[in-house]
């Protein structure tokens, strides 16, 4: 199976208009196993105010430089982290080629080499190398082998941007679905609390209702989400990002 814009040979193929090839001036490239570097730049937009218009957004996507701590946004969703000795590796499965482009570039912007490969069900696995850089993140989120947010967990614009890029789906006209890890029940409730604290209170959908996921509804909440995550990445289809 060929990933749009990332050919099976490892060489870039002319991508469909829906999945534009990443810019050549993107951050450090990542490689598909046995392939050539692939890039995909994140593009952040401006953030202005909260959903009630009463205070500034202090945690929008442009409020700080990219940091490894932002990857907590992937772990709030379906991302996984595993430890090996004094190192750790983060991985996430996604359902579209544009998500691969965006996540590889976001990881590179944080100094993390990444690879990708196709998986079952026309999905794609994006993963970092094992690195000591991710050890603190793994220590905070892993309790034995179970993933659970630390007590201090909160959602910023950059964390939400990564979660949206990995597993977010707008549902016009006034909803957005943020998917969770199917086996991460211990994460679901505290993640909902963090969403509410960010002004994005959502409804938890169980597996029987098309989840697990949080559905964010209402124009004001969607405007808040759009403010926090910034402009869509270049590789994202217009309908795949809240505006």
Label the model's feature ranges.
Residues 1-243:
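Internal intein/HINT superfamily modules and their associated LAGLIDADG
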């Amino acid at each position: 199976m060929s990933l749009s814009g990332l050919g099976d040979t490892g060489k870039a193929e002319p991508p469909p208009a829906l999945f534009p090839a990443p810019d050549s001036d993107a951050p450090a490239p990542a490689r598909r196993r046995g392939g050539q570097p692939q890039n995909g730049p994140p593009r952040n937009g401006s953030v202005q105010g909260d959903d009630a218009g009463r205070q500034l957004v202090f945690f929008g996507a442009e409020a700080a430089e990219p940091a490894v701590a932002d990857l907590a946004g992937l772990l709030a969703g379906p991302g996984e982290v595993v430890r090996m000795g004094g190192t750790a590796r983060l991985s996430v499965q996604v359902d579209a080629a544009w998500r691969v482009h965006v996540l590889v570039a976001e990881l590179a912007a944080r100094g993390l080499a990444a690879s990708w490969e196709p998986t079952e069900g026309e999905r794609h696995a994006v993963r970092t190398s094992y690195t000591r850089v991710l050890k603190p993140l793994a220590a905070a989120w892993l309790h034995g082998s179970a993933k659970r947010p630390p007590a201090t967990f909160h959602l910023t614009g950059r964390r939400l941007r990564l979660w949206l890029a990995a597993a977010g789906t707008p549902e016009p006209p006034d909803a957005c679905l943020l998917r969770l890890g199917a086996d991460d029940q211990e994460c679901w409730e505290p993640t909902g609390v963090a969403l509410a604290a960010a002004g994005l209170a959502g409804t938890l959908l169980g597996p029987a209702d098309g989840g697990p996921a949080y559905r964010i509804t209402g124009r004001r909440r969607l405007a808040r989400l759009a403010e926090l995550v910034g402009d869509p990445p270049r590789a994202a289809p217009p309908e795949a990002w809240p505006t």
